[in-house]
Design a protein with these regions (language model features):
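A short, charged
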Residues: 136-153, 212-225, 280-291
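Short, solvent-exposed aromatic-acidic interface loops
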Residues: 121-126, 190-193, 257-261
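A short, polar/proline- and glycine-enriched secondary-structure boundary/capping micro-motif
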Residues: 126-130, 194-200, 230-232, 263-268
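Conserved, well-ordered active-site substructure
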Residues: 155-177, 227-283, 288, 293-323
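Short, glycine-/Ser/Thr-/acidic-enriched flexible segments
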Residues: 111-113, 151, 182, 190, ...
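Active-site-adjacent helix-turn-beta-strand microarchitecture at beta-sheet edges
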Residues: 151-235
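Zymogen propeptides
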Residues: 2-174, 182-185
């Protein structure tokens, strides 16, 4: 494992610095604003794990929460089985040339959904804070992890992690993983963090869109955009993607589809991604940050091949499960 600096999000950061050079940015204030908004780390909460897992709290407490585990598990290849959790990762591929696709499915069954945890890059909540997924996973003792919603590139959204509200700025369609093991999509602008926690939210994610509801692909997802921030890729077209779905309470599927790599995997459209979850039996499914951020980790190593380059890219958060 390397301790070198995480790869910047080139699709955004290179655009910003490149544009600055091309234009000369005569107004120094414009340069300072861009650096502050997109590159400079801003930490709102340090030692974030000290606050997570405390029911109904805001990120202002001092106690430390620890994940529970039976500790009797066995790893065989990309499968983990214990008395309270099962993880099975399978590779898939189809097509060739420009129609090639490669994806990985993690089928996860838990006795208790609180085994599905969140971790922030550098154990800090804020903006522009990134770290390699394998490094975040190692820091918390994760066996399995996927990239999250990259909350740190935005300052909006309802962000509840491990039962703790870190941000309450409703903006888009969110997803809640409830303490009863179910998943629910919702309009953030119609609720707030306190209400969601009161209703039993364990994790919330703020990216989207919702792909599947009631076992059916959501209509119109092929035209939706999530963020219009400068430097953002469109989420439409054929792209690498990360998502999660719920088959039944405490039974989840996590899917990463590689892309932007000719001959290996071109990626997948939003509608086809949603259909993939339906084919897996998901009743609800939700789209997370994709592109070069699409990354799955198991037992300390990358499972997929981001952008066909076998290289990690720094991200702001992961969802993870321990042994």
């Amino acid at each position: 494992m390397t301790n070198s600096r995480p790869t910047p999000r080139l699709s955004r950061r290179t655009i910003i610095t490149g544009a600055a050079g091309a234009l000369g940015l005569a107004a120094a204030g414009g340069t300072a604003w861009a650096l502050d908004r997109y590159l400079i780390e801003h930490t709102d909460v340090t030692s974030a794990s000290d606050y997570q897992g405390l029911p109904g709290t805001q990120a202002s407490g001092t106690a430390t929460a620890t994940a529970t585990s039976a500790g009797d598990g066995v790893i065989e290849g990309t499968t983990y089985t214990s008395s309270d959790r099962q993880i099975t990762i399978t590779p898939h591929s189809s097509g060739s040339g420009n129609s090639a696709k490669a994806w990985y499915v993690a089928d996860v069954k838990l006795n208790d959904v609180t085994a599905l945890r969140n971790a922030f890059a550098k154990n800090s909540f804020g903006t522009n804070i990134i770290e390699y997924p394998t490094a975040i996973a190692e820091n918390v003792g994760a066996l399995f992890a996927i990239n999250g919603d990259y909350y740190g590139f935005r300052d909006t959204g309802i962000i509840i992690r491990d039962g703790v509200a870190f941000r309450d700025e409703p903006a888009r369609q969110g997803l809640a993983i409830m303490r009863d093991g179910t998943m629910v999509s919702y309009d953030e602008t119609g609720t707030n963090a306190a209400k969601l926690i009161s209703d039993g939210a364990w994790q919330t994610l703020s990216f989207g869109p919702t792909l599947v509801d009631g076992g059916t692909v959501i209509e119109g997802i092929d035209t939706l955009e999530i963020d219009t921030n400068f430097g953002n890729h469109s989420i439409q077209g054929t792209q690498p993607r990360t998502g999660l779905g719920m088959i039944a309470a405490n039974h989840f599927v996590f899917v990463v589809v590689d892309g932007r790599s000719a001959g290996y995997s071109n990626g997948i459209t939003m509608t086809d991604f949603a259909q993939l979850f339906v084919d897996l039996g998901a009743r609800v499914a939700y789209n997370l940050d994709g592109g070069g951020s699409t990354q799955m980790v198991f037992n300390g190593s990358l499972v997929n091949n981001p952008l066909g380059k076998n290289k990690e890219r720094g991200t702001s958060d992961i969802l993870w499960i321990g042994k």
